[in-house]
């Protein structure tokens, strides 16, 4: 698959080199200095940390097919700021994070400004360092994505209402090269015996993903109101992870996750600097994976079996205000203040919460999180922007047992940033 992808990229480069007649480059660079504070891990707090995001792309048009555009894209994101990341519905703090993404594909304008087709192949490499002494590139949750997506774009009007619709399909092959289950370790196998637990595979997090999605962006005449609606359905089979049944027995059946997501955004733009936005998101996750908890003992009488352990229903609400403040930094120039609030509620269908000692409560697990942020942005020139940002996030859950993940803590960051775009 990698060789085929590389061959296609080289072939397209040769074609564009011979037939190119129009070249449109684009480049973005963002840099931030950040001070993080977390309520749970003093080791990951730093007096000053940084983040750099870069993105570069260009469009090449050919005289062979003037409506066909070749578009390679490269992005690189790095952060040394302590930050929470979700891993399989559990949250961990990471000290460093690096993400590299490459895509190459084409846009074909069947009817310019009305109908367009897009095809992309992509490759992503993600490195995440949990502790300071962990070697970068050897992280347990490092992963690589390879895949492609196809989109059909239509732009049309209905009365005074402008629409842009998209229908697409995305395929992703995700691999965790460093991940190993505990019982795959030879020392552990010798201790427990090879016949007492068949869970000796090492690639239990590797998966494939098939995603179909549709969206509609609507402009309501000259009112400056917009509506963005999107629905997606994702089918994710795991390549090796086996389904757990009663008594902890693993079968040959593989885990399959199914996600249904619906998002609605309603923005209003008063002018170039001011506006408001409302948003709602609904996520339904269904899985055939179960959970068998031995509660740290060898007595089977107190074991707990939970069917469909990862099923949940999630709701997200967003509210954002953009407000232009004239003459705040320089006379005759406007600074934009962005105040944002995000509230999230996750209700698990069958998973029970635990107390601090690890014993199950009679209540199902519920997570309630929120983030509030203030962002000041000022354009020095058309291509150069500076910013200052502060954000506070609070995670709260009735799951109090945190030996395998974080559920209750707060996270604060404050920082200064600068970005250039060409």
Predicted features by range, described:
Residues 20-61, 77:
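Short glycine/proline- and aromatic-enriched beta-strand/turn motifs that initiate or cap beta-hairpins
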Residues 408-422:
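Outer-membrane beta-barrel "beta-signal"
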Residues 54-64, 98-110, 148-154, 212-218, ...:
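Residues on the lipid-exposed face of transmembrane beta-strands in outer-membrane beta-barrel proteins
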Residues 215-241, 257-353:
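Detector for outer-membrane/organellar transmembrane beta-barrel domains
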Residues 29-39, 76-84, 121-129, 144, ...:
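Transmembrane beta-strands of outer-membrane beta-barrel pores
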Residues 25-31, 72-76, 117-121, 165-169, ...:
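Membrane-embedded beta-strand positions of outer-membrane beta-barrel proteins
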Residues 66-72, 110-118, 156-165, 220-229, ...:
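Repeated loop/turn-to-beta-strand initiation elements of outer-membrane beta-barrel proteins
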């Amino acid at each position: 698959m990698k060789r085929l992808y590389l061959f296609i990229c080289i072939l397209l480069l040769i074609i564009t080199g011979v037939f190119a007649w129009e070249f449109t480059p684009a480049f973005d660079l963002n840099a931030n200095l950040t001070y993080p504070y977390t309520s749970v891990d003093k080791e990951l707090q730093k007096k000053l940390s940084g983040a750099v995001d870069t993105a570069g792309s260009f469009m090449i048009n050919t005289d062979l097919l003037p409506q066909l555009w070749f578009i390679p894209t490269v992005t690189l994101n790095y952060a040394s700021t302590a930050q929470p990341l979700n891993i399989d519905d559990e949250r961990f703090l990471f000290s460093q994070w690096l993400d590299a993404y490459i895509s190459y594909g084409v846009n074909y304008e069947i009817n310019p400004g009305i109908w367009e087709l897009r095809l992309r192949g992509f490759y992503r490499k993600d490195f995440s360092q949990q502790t300071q002494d962990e070697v970068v590139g050897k992280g347990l949750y490092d992963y690589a994505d390879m895949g492609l997506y196809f989109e059909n774009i239509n732009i049309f009007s209905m009365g005074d209402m402008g629409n842009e619709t998209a229908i697409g399909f995305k395929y992703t092959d995700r691999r965790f090269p460093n991940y190993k289950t505990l019982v795959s370790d030879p020392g552990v196998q010798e201790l427990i015996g090879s016949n007492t637990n068949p869970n000796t595979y090492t690639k239990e997090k590797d998966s494939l993903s098939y995603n179909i999605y549709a969206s509609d962006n609507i402009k309501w005449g000259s009112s400056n109101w917009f509506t963005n609606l999107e629905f997606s359905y994702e089918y994710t089979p795991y390549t090796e992870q086996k389904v757990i049944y009663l008594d902890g027995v693993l079968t040959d059946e593989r885990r399959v996750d199914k996600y249904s997501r619906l998002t609605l955004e309603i923005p209003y733009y008063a002018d170039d600097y001011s506006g408001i936005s409302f948003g709602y998101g609904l996520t339904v996750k269904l899985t055939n994976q179960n959970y068998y908890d031995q509660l740290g003992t060898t007595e089977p009488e107190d074991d707990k079996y939970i069917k469909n352990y990862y099923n949940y229903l999630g709701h997200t609400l967003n509210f954002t205000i953009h407000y232009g403040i004239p003459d705040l930094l320089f006379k005759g120039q406007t600074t934009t203040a962005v105040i944002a609030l995000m509230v999230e509620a996750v209700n698990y269908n069958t998973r029970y919460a635990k107390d601090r000692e690890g014993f199950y409560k009679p209540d199902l697990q519920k997570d309630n999180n929120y983030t509030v942020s203030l962002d000041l942005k000022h354009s020095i020139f058309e291509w150069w922007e500076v910013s200052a940002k502060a954000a506070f996030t609070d995670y709260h859950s009735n799951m109090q047992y945190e030996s395998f993940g974080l559920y209750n803590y707060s996270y604060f960051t404050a920082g200064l940033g600068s970005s250039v775009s060409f």
